Each structure stands twice: as C-alpha cells, then as structure tokens.
Design a protein with these regions (language model features):
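Acidic, low-complexity central loop/insert segments
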Residues: 1-30, 34-39
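Divalent metal-binding acidic/histidine catalytic loops
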Residues: 27-29, 33-157
Length: 157
C-alpha cells in the first residue's frame, strides 16, 4: 500500500493492488481507479489506437476453423490483465473479456484482434472511475443498470 498526495485535488490517494483509492470527506465520496495499471498494461502490449466500444456487435467470437492460429502472441497474459481490470473497476468490459477468455486454450487471429480491440477501448476510457457517494436519495441498497449482454449474440435479439 502506498500513500501519496493528490496535489491537484488536495486529497490523499492510496494505491493498493493496482487500484487508486481517493476519498473526499467533504463531498462524502470514494473513487476507485485503475488508470495507472491500465496505462502500464497498454504500454506493455504496445497499444496506441483507440476504440469507442469494447467489442464489435456482429462478432460472437466463435472458434472458426478457417481462422488461422494466433501463433506466438501473449494472449493469456492479455486476457489475465483484462480479467483483473474487469473484476476490479471496469464492469463495462466484462462481457467482452468473457467472450475472448473462452478461447484462451487455442486463440485464433480473430480472438487476438478482439482482445486488442478491448485494449484499444481501455486506451480511450482509462480515466473512468467507480465513484461511491454517501448521499443516497432513495434507500434501495445498491441499484445498478447494466447492459451486460451487449453484443453477445446478434442471433438472440
């Protein structure tokens, strides 16, 4: 665990397991970010293009026999990094990561390109955080709306 001052906001930031925790007592908020970890993953896998969506809607990432093997690419390393990011602070990429992780045993070029597209999306959205606020207007517990099945299978719609 590392403590460091967040000079532009005047708050203390705690870094723990790749996550930055920012607490603002006055506003009653806690923010969790993985921007520095995401940037290190993007640098490690040499990602420089951006994407506005994590997955292509028409692609269901089935194992296509005609598709060539991905060869000697760090597919499992990328999938592991993406799973860590999705599980900690980025539920928006969970479905896309699940779709490519299914093919870790025998990745094809299309699966490698799909994993790179998720990384491209993270480059575009690395600044996003999870923000928790103590001010609740309605006491309903945690209320979340998510399209977790975005672009899963076009044939099921």
């Amino acid at each position: 665990m590392v403590l460091s001052p967040d000079e532009e906001l005047g708050r203390i930031v705690i870094f723990f397991l790749g996550c930055a925790f920012r607490r603002d007592r006055e506003a009653g908020t806690i923010e969790i970010s993985q921007e520095s970890y995401i940037r290190s993953v993007l640098e490690r896998f040499k990602i420089c293009r951006t994407s506005s969506i994590p997955a292509s809607p028409a692609n269901d990432y089935r194992s296509v026999k005609e598709d060539e093997d991905a060869g000697d690419v760090p597919f499992r390393e990328v999938v592991g990094s993406l799973m860590w990011i999705a599980n900690q602070t980025r539920p928006d990429i969970s479905n896309a990561v699940r779709a490519v992780a299914r093919h870790s045993h025998e990745p094809k070029i299309s699966h490698w390109k799909a994993a790179q597209k998720i990384l491209n999306y993270l480059l575009e959205t690395a600044h996003l955080t999870l923000k928790f606020n103590k001010e609740a207007t309605v006491d309903v517990g945690t209320l979340v709306y998510v399209d977790a099945d975005f672009a899963s299978k076009a044939t099921d719609r």
